[in-house]
């Protein structure tokens, strides 16, 4: 699984902005309408939320096409999953990796 430290960032009003300090347990999924991989990842997170209510928060779903900067950076990689501003995965999501990032904090 490819992981990359993206720095502390969150999406507010469709823009990428730094966070001070990091928000613990924040999940952002960058998606695109009509993307079957996006639907699979959002569905997986919803299922994991039901199974692990105390661990998995409600994700923030962001449309990559709503902002030119997002589209140019992430348009070819959706879905893109961040936990606390750290890129966890794109295209697919491994449940164990996701739960570990929420439980232990995201890592490289």
Where in this protein do the model-derived segments appear?
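Thiol-based oxidoreductase modules, predominantly thioredoxin-like and allied folds used
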Residues: 54-68
């Amino acid at each position: 699984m490819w992981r990359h430290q993206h720095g502390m960032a969150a999406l507010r009003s469709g823009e990428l902005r730094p966070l001070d300090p990091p928000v613990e347990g924040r999940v952002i999924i960058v998606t695109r309408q009509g993307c079957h991989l996006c639907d699979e990842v959002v569905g997986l997170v919803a299922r994991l939320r039901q199974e692990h209510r105390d661990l998995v928060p409600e994700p923030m779903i962001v449309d990559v096409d709503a902002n030119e900067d997002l589209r140019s950076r992430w348009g070819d990689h959706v879905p893109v999953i961040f936990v606390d501003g750290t890129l966890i995965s794109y295209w697919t999501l491994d449940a164990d990796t996701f739960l570990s990032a929420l439980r232990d904090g995201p890592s490289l």
